[in-house]
Each structure stands twice: as C-alpha cells, then as structure tokens.
C-alpha cells in the first residue's frame, strides 16, 4: 500500500506509517512511502 508521503529515505516513512497503520515500518519506493 502506498501512502501519500514523499520520501528520500525509509526513515521518513516510519512516523507516517505509525500514524496510519500503527506499525512503524515502511519502505521508500519511487519517492513515496510504501
């Protein structure tokens, strides 16, 4: 699932994923968090 968060590194996805899914995990793919 891609979320609308721009990123350059996976670290930027952690807070956003935690907010949306309650799990602090994420990858940065094509400039967006997954």
UniProtKB/Swiss-Prot annotation:
Family to which this protein belongs: Belongs to the short scorpion toxin superfamily. Potassium channel inhibitor family. Alpha-KTx 02 subfamily.
Location relative to the cell: Secreted
Function, as annotated: Potent inhibitor of Kv1/KCNA voltage-gated potassium channels.
Xref: SUPFAM superfamilies: Scorpion toxin-like
Site (Basic residue of the functional dyad): 27
Name the UniProt record assigns to this protein: Potassium channel toxin alpha-KTx 2.6
Principal location class: secreted
Tissue spec: Expressed by the venom gland.
Annotated organism of origin: Centruroides limbatus (Bark scorpion)
GO terms under cellular component: extracellular region
